[in-house]
């Protein structure tokens, strides 16, 4: 069986997918191949470890955070159909081309704390329509429902892309010989029920009561009202956890906690929560803060953080009902 290339797949898609949008997605995919090659060199190229500074989030940047960010900025800021860029790693947005039809937001290397131990990392991206001929910061303040495409590239045992353009979710696998993304799964679906959950349990003492109650029920398994056992998984890379959910169901929680009351959550709305929520919802799952649907949040700042509860629909709805 011959697999469609990513470019061929994009040519066949309908709906929101214009030829211009297809070109932007192709450029993101090509840049992620370059990131993949840098990751594979690792210690051989002297690019592991800290870059010696912090990003706007107050997180210590890894060398590959900076390298991946630079690759994406350099490739997209000259793209004729990109009006502006926003990165988790940079304080402000980056202007691109006048009259560019799209805005691209990204987390260049999600889970970068995994780099030095050779575990999975990924690139997350979100594409919004541009609002003006010359992009302004306010143009990025669009709810997730306005996304025209979203996806991620997972750098794991094989390199894979998950993509939605508003018409379901598809998986592509990078052929290492031809360096081509090939379609390997169409119409990805998240099961409504699950017996797997992902959460950083070390924060339990900081959680709100609804989340504590929910997790206590899961841990009690058959002896609780749930009457079945659950397994816990935690990759420390949202791309890895969401990919597992898209493949076999599950629920991922990074809930609101009281560790730092100034932060409503830990994950970034524009670079992580929105694109992952679009993917999960397009695959039949659900996504919420525990109180509101993530895709309906009207952002007020570029680096806004939100709680995230995402995955199999029946479990997400159960957590929401506890709030």
UniProtKB/Swiss-Prot annotation:
It catalyses: beta-D-fructose 1,6-bisphosphate + H2O = beta-D-fructose 6-phosphate + phosphate. Mg(2+) 2 binds at residues 107, 110, 272. GO terms for biological process: fructose 1,6-bisphosphate metabolic process; fructose 6-phosphate metabolic process; fructose metabolic process; gluconeogenesis; sucrose biosynthetic process. Pathway: Carbohydrate biosynthesis; gluconeogenesis. InterPro entries: FBPase_C_dom, FBPase_class-1, FBPase_N, FBPtase. Its cofactor is Mg(2+). GO terms for cellular component: cytosol. Binds 2 magnesium ions per subunit. Mg(2+) 1 binds at residues 88, 107, 109. Substrate binds at residues 110-113, 200. Belongs to the FBPase class 1 family. This is Fructose-1,6-bisphosphatase class 1. The lineage of its organism: Bacteria, Pseudomonadati, Pseudomonadota, Gammaproteobacteria, Moraxellales. The gene is fbp.
């Amino acid at each position: 069986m011959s697999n469609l290339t990513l470019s061929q797949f994009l040519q066949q898609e309908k709906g929101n997918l214009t030829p211009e949008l297809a070109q932007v997605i192709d450029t993101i995919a090509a840049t992620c191949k370059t990131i993949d090659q840098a990751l594979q060199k690792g210690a051989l190229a002297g690019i592991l470890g800290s870059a010696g500074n912090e990003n706007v989030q107050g997180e210590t940047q890894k060398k590959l955070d900076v390298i991946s960010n630079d690759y994406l900025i350099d490739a997209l800021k000259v793209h004729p159909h990109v009006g502006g860029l926003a990165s988790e790693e940079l304080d402000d947005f980056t202007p691109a081309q006048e009259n560019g039809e799209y805005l691209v937001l990204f987390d260049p290397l999600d889970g970068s704390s995994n780099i030095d131990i050779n575990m999975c990392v990924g690139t997350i991206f979100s594409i919004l329509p541009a609002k003006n001929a010359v992009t302004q910061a306010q143009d990025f303040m669009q709810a997730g429902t306005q996304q025209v495409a979203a996806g991620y590239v997972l750098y794991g045992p094989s390199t894979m892309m998950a993509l939605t353009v508003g018409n379901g979710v598809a998986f592509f696998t990078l052929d290492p010989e031809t360096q081509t993304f090939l379609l390997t799964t169409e119409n990805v679906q998240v099961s409504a029920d699950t017996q797997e959950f992902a959460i950083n349990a070390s924060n339990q003492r900081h959680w709100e009561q609804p989340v504590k109650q929910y997790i206590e029920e899961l841990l009690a398994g058959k002896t609780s009202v749930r009457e079945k056992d659950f397994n816990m998984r935690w990759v420390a890379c949202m791309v890895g956890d969401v990919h597992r959910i898209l493949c076999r169901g599950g629920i991922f929680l990074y809930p609101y906690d009281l560790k730092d009351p100034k932060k409503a959550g830990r994950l970034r709305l524009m670079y992580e929560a929105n694109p992952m929520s679009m993917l999960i919802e397009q695959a039949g799952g659900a996504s919420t803060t525990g109180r509101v649907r993530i895709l309906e949040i009207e952002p007020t700042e570029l680096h806004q953080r939100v709680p995230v509860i995402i995955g199999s629909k029946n479990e997400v709805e159960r957590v929401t009902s506890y709030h």
